[in-house]
Amino acid sequence: MFEVTTIDAHVAGGAVRLVTAGLPQLTASSLEERQQLLSERAGPVLAALAREPRGHSGVVVVVLTEGDTPDADAGMLLFRSSGAAAACGHAIIGATGLAITRGVLTPRRHGTVRYDTLAGRLTATSIVLAGSGPVPVRYTGPAATVLQPNMPVNIGRRALRTDVVWSGTELVAIVDAEAAGVPLVSSRALELQRAGADVIRHLDESIRLTHPDTGAHLSVALAVFIGPAPESGMDIRSGTVRADGTVEHTPSAEATAAIAAVLSAMGLMPIGRRLVHQGLLGTTLFATILAMGDAEGRPTVDVEIGGEAWPTGDHVFRFEEADPLLSRD
């Protein structure tokens, strides 16, 4: 038997699990190599932390390592139930809030953590307040840009339009929920899942998009259905479907950045304006455009995403070598 300890939090309802002990030590020269080694040596354990009975499809497991660059405070590796991930906004917010308040890491600059991730540099800022409760965190990452506006897409017999956006970390397709006939309520998640799968499949089969910086081929990671938020003080409500079929009932951070990029491209979101984005649970994240730029003639925006890390528990997970769930694919 062996044990793995974690600290858990949720961010707008998205579960984040920060590993604090129990995984093998990693000696490798790059973040990519550390991820590969960790997957090889502890892949079943990481999968077990993110899957039932210890987890669920929405859990993101965070492992902090050394960074690749001299000014990084830490490297960040992420694992979902479907496997390794390059970046996740909920994980950045949750892990930062937990790591700073619990002393897991001590950043060089008070309240600011610079992460090296497989998606690039992400910088998070947290103001730790006295007492218990949520920890507010904001972060910025690589610039977002609209790659293909107003792309045709089919959902069943409906001919729709979608904006395909590079959020800075993932490829996102944004669709009007009313036009798609998809209600933005948790009780209709199955319909949302089916529509999202149609959007992702159609786009991946019909167009080829590349990373704006590296030129690498990109597949659609998220289908985001948007509509007006029913409550005052909210700007947009959404339901998000991941390529692995997971329905995110929270306001996805990557979707938030992508929506901000689209609104900016339409002239509806100037620098400094705050966007309040509501998910199916009614919880929120916010986005603020800090700067605008240009990449090969395409407008880009630097987006700050903010939310709150709510600590939910400290855990000691026990693993028996004979547990059949440790060996499943």
Language model regions located:
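A glycine-rich beta-to-alpha transition motif near the start of alpha/beta enzyme domains, typified by
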Residues: 1-152, 176-329
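Internal alpha/beta core interface subdomains
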Residues: 163, 167-182
